């Protein structure tokens, strides 16, 4: 499968695309506090591989309970090099979990950084089809604090009105995990987009 060429991403935008694009650089000193927004995610064990032009996708059933609303998990995928920045800093990896609620889309973004102490990699297990719900939970931090904003998908079509939950704490990944992602689809991250006066909120899971 021929994947999107990220060296040509300046050609992805269409005239009618929203001005509120993703990803963005999140300046923590500018975020506003968010009082509610506690969530829980559950996964089922079976994962199906699906290679698409936008990159390799992993189809899996699961749910996100956000306050009193249920979102259904459609798929997840990886980015070799995080798409979102935090205070100008890029994490090693970003995982996107794509959820649906009717015609609405929400993406949970989870960062990963290589750790010398992490020897067995969840990412490699997923590509080796050695995966269950416990493996997928390793892609999420225990602390569910996050930044929230409204943006777009980061691959064409750049659909608008996407709810983004960008988790603040990275998970540890192995060097082998990072190498697997780089071998499959190197540097597949979109350039940072203008914030354009959007409001970014912060939910503290520890409160």
Give names to the regions the model predicted:
Residues 1-207:
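Alpha-carbonic anhydrase
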């Amino acid at each position: 499968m021929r994947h999107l060429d990220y060296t040509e991403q300046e050609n992805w935008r269409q005239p009618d695309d929203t001005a509120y694009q993703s990803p963005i650089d999140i300046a923590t000193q500018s975020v506003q506090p968010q009082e509610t927004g506690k969530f829980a995610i559950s996964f089922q064990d079976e994962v199906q591989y699906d290679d698409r032009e936008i990159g390799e996708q992993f189809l899996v059933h699961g749910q996100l309970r956000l306050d009193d609303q249920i979102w259904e998990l459609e798929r997840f995928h990886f980015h070799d090099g995080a798409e979102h920045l935090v205070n100008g800093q890029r994490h090693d990896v970003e995982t996107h979990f794509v959820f649906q609620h009717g015609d609405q889309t929400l993406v949970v973004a989870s960062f990963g950084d290589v750790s010398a102490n992490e020897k067995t990699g969840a990412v490699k297990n997923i590509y080796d089809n050695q995966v269950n719900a416990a493996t997928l939970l390793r892609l999420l931090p225990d602390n569910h604090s996050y930044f929230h904003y409204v943006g777009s998908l980061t691959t064409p079509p750049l659909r608008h009105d996407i709810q983004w939950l960008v988790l603040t704490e990275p998970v540890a990944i192995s060097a082998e995990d990072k190498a697997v992602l780089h071998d499959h689809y190197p540097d597949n991250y979109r350039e940072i987009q203008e914030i354009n006066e959007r409001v970014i909120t912060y939910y503290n899971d520890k409160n």
